[in-house]
Structure formats: structure tokens, C-alpha cells
């Protein structure tokens, strides 16, 4: 897909609010990403998150860390404010990704634990972190950059526009858990 077709596809498949939000996050995000490389990080502090909520492997690792690893401070980061309120009622240390506390914890935590991409937590604060992708299932089909049909075949294309608009797709984790070396 050439760049002009990609731009047309973006405008036809997103509402204008999403496009404006994406542009604002890009203009503010890139300077924040550069700043995040300069801030010291604590190896005791781990931020965890998943774009679909407090679920899957990340949830269970959070619960394990909270219960058994007293040298680790697990912090749940979410983009859903109502989810944060529910988690806090259950005693879970949870923050909104763009709140001052959320940004502070993201900028000062060394470990980022997520299920899909760094954007599950906050890509823009991840400079200098150790990224761990727990993934959310066992692959039985082609995904992401291996796809040739559907919406992913348009997003997961290595071109300059995608690298600028979706930089989190191109950041490889430092550790990726898998069921075998063949995955």
C-alpha cells in the first residue's frame, strides 16, 4: 500500500476526534519519550497494564507480585478511569496513564510488563525501561507484521508513516515470553 492510500485509509476508518487525539499525542509524546530516557528508573518499581483491562497474564503476574514479592512495588496503569476506581476499591495500586501520578510512576519504573504493546501502559514514557511482553495467548495464526489481509495488513506495514504514527508497534520488547523457540 503506498503512502497516499494509507493516509486515505486512516481518514476513512477513523473519526476526526481519534485523528486529532492521535496528532496531539504525537506532538506531546515524542518530546516526552526523549525526556523519559533521562529520568532515573527504579528496579523495585514495576508498572503493569493491558489495553483491555485488568485481565490475562498481566493480571495474574500483578497479583503474584503483590502477594509474594515484597521487594517489588507493582503498579497497575490503565487508560480507563472507571476501571481504576474499581481496582482501587479492591486495594490495587492503580493509576490513569496521563495523570501526574501515572506519568510519575511510568517515568520512574524500570520494568514495563504488558500483553500486547508498550502502549498498553504508556509508550511515550518508556525510554530506558526494560520491556516485558507476556503476550495474551498462543499463536495459531499469522499476526501483526505477518498478516496479509484485514486491518492489520494496513497498520503493520514498515513505512515511514506507520513508524511515525504507530511507533509502539516497532519497539521490540527486551523479553518476550513464548511456549517454544519456534513461535
What residue spans do the PLM features occupy?
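Membrane-proximal basic amphipathic "stem/tether" segments
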Residues: 1-50, 157
Amino acid at each position: 500500500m503506498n503512502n497516499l492510500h494509507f493516509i486515505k485509509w486512516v481518514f476513512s476508518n477513523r473519526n476526526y476526534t481519534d485523528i486529532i487525539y492521535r496528532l496531539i499525542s504525537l506532538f506531546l509524546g515524542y518530546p516526552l519519550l526523549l525526556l523519559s530516557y533521562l529520568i532515573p528508573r527504579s528496579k523495585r518499581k514495576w508498572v503493569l497494564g493491558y489495553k483491555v483491562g485488568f485481565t490475562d497474564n498481566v493480571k495474574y503476574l500483578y497479583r503474584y507480585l503483590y502477594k509474594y514479592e515484597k521487594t517489588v512495588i507493582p503498579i497497575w496503569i490503565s487508560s480507563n478511569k472507571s476501571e481504576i476506581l474499581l481496582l482501587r476499591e479492591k486495594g490495587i495500586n492503580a493509576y490513569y496513564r496521563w495523570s501526574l501520578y501515572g506519568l510519575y510512576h511510568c517515568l520512574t519504573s524500570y520494568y514495563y510488563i504488558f500483553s500486547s504493546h508498550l502502549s498498553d501502559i504508556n509508550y511515550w514514557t518508556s525510554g530506558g525501561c526494560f520491556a516485558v511482553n507476556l503476550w495474551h495467548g498462543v499463536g495459531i495464526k499469522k499476526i501483526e507484521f505477518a498478516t496479509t489481509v484485514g486491518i492489520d495488513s494496513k497498520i503493520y506495514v514498515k513505512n515511514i508513516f506507520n513508524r511515525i504514527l504507530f511507533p509502539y508497534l516497532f519497539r521490540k520488547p527486551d523479553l518476550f515470553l513464548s511456549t517454544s523457540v519456534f513461535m
